[in-house]
Every structure is written in structure tokens, then in C-alpha cells.
């Protein structure tokens, strides 16, 4: 928000989560002026708010292929500039390494289980490319990050509405 203010631009940041505890934690530990909304994004009633950019971190593994296709189709009509996903990449190596380091690290049982589930349910690049194609998205960029993560950037301005 500081960067936007330094450029004399108005910005409204909205955090959406279905988990009340996550939202309470975020509100207590926030450094930015963010409006938080409790909604179930996976619900068929959920409406993506019109905005300039949609940024999602470590979430799309909750969607089935078809749900993600529908979400992307809907998002293209609501987002002005870009959709950005920061996600895990599913692989045998990442799963095995998480199991190993999870054993060594003092993670709670829940964190270990959630981490393994997230890796098992995350997408491969090929799967995401097929999903993007089905959603009518032809322009996108993958940026690979350490520890089996990637950033997927989908510019919206180049898509036909």
C-alpha cells in the first residue's frame, strides 16, 4: 500500500478466506490496511469481486480440474489486469522431501498432514497448461521458484472478453 500511496494511486486490498480462525490471525498480524471477508470461495454462490488483480497463494489445489476451469473463466470477466497464483508443484521428489524434513522438523501433526495433502493435490505444469487451455487462456507465464513452487501469471488485458 505504501508503494501505491507514493505513486498517488488508490488501492483497496481485500483478503478472502473461508476459515474464521485464519481471518482472525490475519487481522491481528497485518501490516497493511486490508479488508477481510469470510467467504467460501469453493461455494457455487461465491462471486469474484471486480478488481484489478487477483492474487492467490497456495490455494488452487482445493479445486478440482473442472472447478478451476470454471473459476478461471469467471475470473477473466472480473479481473482487469492479471491473475497471479503462487503454488506448489506436485512431484514425487517434493512429497518425499517434505515427508523426510517433516519427520526431522518440529511441525505439528496437522501441519505435516496438511503439507502432504497439499503436495498430493497440487497440479503439475502439464495439468495446469491443459486447464488453462480449457479455460480459454492462451497467454500465461510460469516462474519457477525454489522448493517446488511456481508463480503463474495470467495477463488479462490480452484476453478477449
Short names for language-model regions:
Residues 1-44:
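Class I SAM-dependent methyltransferase SAM/SAH-binding core
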Residues 79-90:
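Conserved beta-strand signature within the Rossmann-like core of class I S-adenosyl-L-methionine
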Residues 121, 125-156:
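Conserved Class I S-adenosyl-L-methionine
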Residues 34, 52, 81:
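Conserved acidic residues
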Residues 75:
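Class I S-adenosylmethionine-dependent transferase superfamily signal
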Residues 59:
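Hydrophobic adenine-recognition pocket in adenosine-nucleotide-binding enzymes
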Residues 55-56:
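A conserved beta-strand element that flanks and buttresses the S-adenosyl-L-methionine
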Residues 88-134:
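C-terminal alpha-helical "lid/dimerization" subdomain adjacent to the S-adenosyl-L-methionine
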Amino acid at each position: 500500500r505504501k508503494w501505491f500511496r507514493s505513486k498517488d494511486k488508490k488501492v483497496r486490498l481485500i483478503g478472502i478466506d473461508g476459515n474464521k480462525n485464519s481471518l482472525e490471525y490475519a487481522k491481528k498480524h497485518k501490516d497493511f490496511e486490508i479488508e477481510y471477508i469470510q467467504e467460501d470461495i469453493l461455494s457455487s454462490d461465491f462471486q469474484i469481486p471486480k478488481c484489478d488483480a487477483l492474487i492467490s497463494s497456495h490455494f488452487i489445489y482445493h479445486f478440482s480440474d473442472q472447478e478451476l476451469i470454471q473459476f478461471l473463466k469467471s475470473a477473466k470477466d472480473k479481473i482487469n489486469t492479471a491473475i497471479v497464483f503462487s503454488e506448489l508443484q506436485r512431484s514425487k521428489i517434493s512429497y518425499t522431501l517434505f515427508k523426510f524434513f517433516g519427520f526431522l522438523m518440529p511441525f505439528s501433526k496437522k501441519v505435516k498432514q496438511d503439507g502432504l495433502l497439499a503436495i498430493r493435490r497440487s497440479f503439475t505444469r502439464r495439468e495446469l497448461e491443459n486447464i488453462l487451455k480449457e479455460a480459454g487462456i492462451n497467454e500465461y507465464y510460469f516462474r519457477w521458484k525454489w522448493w517446488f513452487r511456481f508463480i503463474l501469471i495470467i495477463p488479462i488485458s490480452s484476453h478477449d472478453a
